Amino acid sequence: MAQLSHIVYFTLHDPSPQKVADLVSACHRYLSHHDGVVYFSVGTLNRELARPVNDLNYDVSLHIVFDCKDSHDRYQVEPSHLRFIEEQKPAWKQVRVFDSDLTQA
C-alpha cells in the first residue's frame, strides 16, 4: 500500500509572529500523534527563499505522511483533528491542501 502525503498551506488573516506561533503550537498539540503517521512536521515560510518559482502566499505549512490512505481517512474524522479545525479556522484567510500518493525508490 502506498504512503500518502498530506501537505497543508495556511494563510492567516493576521500573520503576526504570535498568531503564526499559535498555529504552529496548535498543529503540534492536535495533529502530531495520530495512528498511522510516519512523518510529521510543521513550519513557517522562509522569506529569504524568494526565487521566481517560490510561492510566498502562506504563513504556515503542515507536512504529514501517513502509512496508507486508510490512516489518512481516519485522521480526517478524529476528534482532535476536528477540534483543531474548529479552534483554528477563524484565523485562516486561505487553506490549500495537497494530497499525494508516494512511491518508494
What are these model-predicted stretches?
Residues 1-59, 63, 67-74, 101-105:
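Short S/T/G/P-rich N-terminal loop/turn motif that feeds into the first structured element of a domain
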Residues 36-41, 87-99:
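Conserved short beta-strand edge segments in small beta-sheet-based binding/regulatory domains
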Residues 69-95:
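C-terminal structural segments of small proteins and small subunits
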